[in-house]
Amino acid sequence: MTDKTILERSLGIFNLEKVDRDIFSWTGKNVGYKRIFGGQVMAQTLIAAYKTIDVEHYAHSFHSYFLRPGDMDKSITFTVDRIRDGKSFTTRTVKAIQNGEAIFNCSCLLYTSDAADEGLG
């Protein structure tokens, strides 16, 4: 496998497919590892949260829990719970589910550029 192929397959992990309003999916792709790297599922949950927001936001805080190991060969479903949509801050809880069980859970607080300009971020 060439370096270009490895890079293209690796970047594909960030392409989440919209299934429903607050549900996204990633189709498992083996890039040479059996288990999912924790940073991958963390990034994917943050991407899922961002996909539920219309205005540009920045991550302010991110609290997460690794619950079970993930399998690179199997798809992951990301469910987003819209906790709060405020003027400056937005809160989301995202669960990554594989084989019907949560493998990762996070709560993230995101803020707008206006909040950052006011020194709130």
Predicted segments — roles?
Residues 1-75, 85:
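Hydrophobic, proline/glycine-rich low-complexity stretches
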Residues 70-110:
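Hydrophobic/aromatic-rich structural module bridging two neighboring secondary-structure elements via a short loop
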Residues 111-116:
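Conserved small/polar residues in nucleotide/adenosyl-binding loops
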Residues 119-121:
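N-terminal low-complexity segments that are often proline-rich with Ser/Thr-Pro
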